[in-house]
């Protein structure tokens, strides 16, 4: 039942995340580029500077992995996986790969960052999408009661969002696959921690 619930949620979140970008593309740039490429769904070029990329990936992992260990599980989205063990792995993977990371990457790095970057340049665009990414994640925790924990999570999410945007645009030629893979990995680890704690 949990797997079906997560699959339905994932489809709903994908539809929501794709609606505004699709309408924008349909009205503004439909004749110039395919929708999937416009969002960044293409293979990244071969990396020549792996060391920098690996350092940024490790940095984001070090920021994100402790969160489910230090925050009350009841306020995190992964709460539904608490103590489910191996039986919850399929649902956790749907949640992590399709239900959260893909819609968020489409909306923040595929749409917001790329559209703002076209108009204002990389730095203001990446800062803006990172702030929005952190703020949205903070809004989801706003009712948790502990404003300090919420603020820390928002700041960590902003830094992670900035790093993911930087990796996409500066190291992956605008491909969304890099940040989606990292984001899915982070969410999978968080869900696995919930499954077995």
Q: Where are each of the predicted segments found?
A:
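Juxtamembrane helix-loop-helix connectors linking adjacent transmembrane helices
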Residues: 2-9, 33-103, 118, 145, ...
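Membrane-embedded alpha-helical segments of multi-pass membrane proteins
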Residues: 11-19, 90-94, 154-159, 185
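Membrane-water interface of transmembrane alpha-helices
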Residues: 19-34
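Hydrophobic alpha-helical transmembrane segments
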Residues: 50-54, 90-94, 123-128, 151-155, ...
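Aromatic-anchored segments of alpha-helical transmembrane domains
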Residues: 60-66, 130-139, 184-192
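Membrane-interface helix/loop boundary segments of multi-pass membrane proteins
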Residues: 106-128, 169-174
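Small-polar-interrupted transmembrane alpha-helices in polytopic inner-membrane proteins
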Residues: 122-138, 157, 161
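Functionally important transmembrane alpha-helices
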Residues: 150-197
